Amino acid sequence: MAAWLSGLLHDVGRFEQIRRFNTFSDADSIDHALLSTEILFGTKEDASCGRIRQVILDPSWDIYLYKAIKYHSAYRLPPDLSEMEKTYCQILRDADKIDIFRVNLETPMEDIYNTTTETLKQAEVTSEVLQAFKERHAVLRALKKTPVDNVVGHISLYYE
């Protein structure tokens, strides 16, 4: 139940992100995963503003949903997760990666990366991004500087 619901709900923050900032880029706006948790579970200041009870009445799944959604786009999972929390986080992260790969197969690169094919072909992969790729792990968002760094970053998700 929690895995299915987290898959349905994890990107609700994207709608607010595009409304507020006119972009899906977390680097250029706000962390959409954190925004999703605020929309669903409220804020520290006001948990009553969350909308999760409009979707599921049983609060016993909340901790798994909250953590899976909050950390689905994090570079690394926090080490203090319980085994069950970690499992739900990994399920959602893997499903999200599969969706990213699907989008990259079905959508023109110009639309995904908001640049021209020529710019992508001429851009160079920065040394930090190349190093992360060679080390066979995901690329930290802050390291991506050129348009092609984003492509390499998506490919590197395979290693995680």
For the regions a protein language model found, what residue spans apply to each?
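Divalent metal-dependent phosphate-bond-processing catalytic cores, especially two-metal-ion Mg2+/Mn2+ enzymes
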Residues: M1, L9, R20, A74-E160
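His-Asp-centered metal-binding catalytic motifs of divalent-metal-dependent phosphohydrolases/nucleases
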Residues: M1-S25, S36, L40, L65-Y75
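An active-site-proximal "capping" alpha-helix that borders the catalytic cofactor pocket
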Residues: I30-S48
